[in-house]
Amino acid sequence: MAQQELELQENFLNKDTEYNQLNNSKSQILNEEIEYQIGKQKIFRLSIAFMTLFTAYGSCTSLISGLYKTLNFTNLGLMSLFSTYFTFAFASFVAKGIIQKFSFRVVFTISNLGYTACIAAGIWVFMCEGSEQSGFCSVEAIYSIVNFTAALCGICASTLWVAQGGYVDILSSTCPSKRGVLIGYFFSFMSASNIIGYILASILLNFFGNMSYFLLNSVLSLVSAYMMYVLPDPYSPNIKSQNDNRNKQQIKPLKEQIKEVLVLLKDKKALYLIPYYWLVGVILGCYASYIFVVVKYSLNEEQVQYAPQYVSYVVIFLGLSGVICGIVVGKLADKYNLLILAIGATLLVTTAIIFSLLGLIVKEYALCFLIAILWGCCDSTNSSLQVIIASKDFPGQLQMFSLQKLANSLGCSFALIMGILLQSYPPYCILFIVFLFQIISTICLAVLLSLKNTENKV
């Protein structure tokens, strides 16, 4: 009888323990779902602000080269983009210290104004159209103004994007099972800016002219600055102590900030990721100027003068494919191995390169839409995955986002400078350079995957 009572008591205690564990599990799932919904709302507001900014700025990166060429400023567009990404690279070293000193919304707002100045420089250029090339309208003055504002934009871009990585990382850390969904959600909105931006560009360039294009985009950029200023704080009540600790931290000297970024190079995981981050930048630098080349090759003599408008039609599909890929890759990232997905994304770059070469041979305008779709998939997929990998493998480390943006911007600067130096060579030369970096990136990701698999077995 006593034995039966003891067994009953043990069963009751076991059931009670299981019941408590079940309740704790349900409570944890419920809390994570609440954090996910809160985080989703905040990321939605951040995404809309970024989408508005890059609706204004994004189309400029692809069209600016062609637009400035219409005024016989042959390399001005590519040089300004190079100035942006070159300064972006080295400003990334100190971005963490600046973000640490101010609130996210202040950093976002001030950084936004750098983009506004860069866009507004286009107003100055086209105000000088038809006037004597002297004073502030001289060639030297125009090159100086455009490149100065481009460099300012690069400095602001470093703080904007490192802050973006930190903001999203904080929100996604409260619901790790939905990390990929939240980051993919952001980049799908970013890609939507291409659709809106190029539809807007085609309307403005066709019916209102170049001056109106830069003027309205400057206004849109200021609107996004206000949207960023009213953003909510990313910290939830559950992790409010993180915010307090962050504010108490002292800003480290510049030398130490640079060391914090470079010390990551001793980490094998970070070291093998750098070629991948570099490739993402090369992709941006390549299609930002190459889409214009492919489209121009497909046009006849009468259509060439309207090349920027034809480019704007094509890049709408680049944005559409980016939106879809941003959503899809976010969902896949929460279910599958991130490195395998990244390897697949680098192989997608090869497909885009092959069809880009085909576009130069066939010279068919309809094929340019497929080429744009492929480059849009490459850009959105790889941009999303690089942030998800940095956020998952290096949680809470803003310096990893600095290293990521350093590699991105150097890769983009390299592609842009190659675009300038290889202008007298056949346009497919730049594609072979991209292909070379794609191979290196794929090999490094495969080695990193092998190392991780070995660690897991041990």
Feature roles, as predicted:
Residues 51, 118, 132-160, 278, ...:
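Hydrophobic core of transmembrane alpha-helices in multi-pass small-molecule transporters
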Residues 57-62, 268-315, 383:
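Extracytoplasmic gate region of multi-pass secondary transporters
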Residues 60-62, 66, 158-174, 291, ...:
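Intracellular juxtamembrane helix-capping segments at the cytosolic ends
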Residues 81-89, 153, 157, 176-206, ...:
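Glycine-rich segments within core transmembrane alpha-helices of 12-TM secondary carriers
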Residues 88-92, 289, 310-334, 345-352, ...:
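Transmembrane alpha-helices of Major Facilitator/SLC transporters
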Residues 90-104, 205-206, 323-338, 422-424:
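Helix-to-loop junctions at the C-terminal end of transmembrane segments
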Residues 113-139, 347-363, 416:
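C-terminal ends and interior cores of transmembrane alpha-helices
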Residues 339-382:
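C-terminal transmembrane helical hairpin of 12-TM major facilitator-type secondary transporters
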